[in-house]
Amino acid sequence: MAASGGTKKAQSGGRRLREPSSRPSRRARQRPRRGALRKAGRFL
């Protein structure tokens, strides 16, 4: 996990999706860690 803007953005999004684990359950599953890693890789 590289400390970069991409990871920060991914973490904020993950936290938002993790908080309301009632409606965006499928979205949270689709963007658990793969989305964060993909965003970080793209930003790096």
From Swiss-Prot:
GO CC term (a single one): nucleolus
Superkingdom of origin: Eukaryota
A Pfam family per the record: PACMP
One GO MF term attached to the UniProt entry: poly-ADP-D-ribose binding
InterPro entries assigned to the protein according to its UniProt record, in alphabetical order: PACMP
Protein's UniProt keywords contain Repeat: no
Major localization class: nucleus
Keywords linked to the UniProt accession: Chromosome, Nucleus
Region Disordered, residue ranges: 1-44
Subcellular location: Nucleus, Nucleolus; Chromosome
Biased composition (Basic residues): 24-44
One example of a Gene Ontology biological process annotation: regulation of protein ADP-ribosylation
Function summary: Micropeptide that acts as a regulator of DNA repair both by preventing KLHL15-mediated ubiquitination and degradation of RBBP8/CtIP, and by promoting the poly-ADP-ribosyltransferase activity of PARP1. Prevents KLHL15-mediated ubiquitination of RBBP8/CtIP by competitively blocking the association between KLHL15 and RBBP8/CtIP. Recruited to DNA damage sites via association with poly-ADP-ribose chains, and enhances the poly-ADP-ribosyltransferase activity of PARP1.
Self-association and partners: Interacts with KLHL15; preventing ubiquitination and degradation of RBBP8/CtIP. Interacts with PARP1.
Protein name: Poly-ADP-ribosylation-amplifying and CtIP-maintaining micropeptide
Natural source organism: Homo sapiens
Lineage: Eukaryota, Metazoa, Chordata, Craniata, Vertebrata
Gene behind the chain: MARCHF6-DT
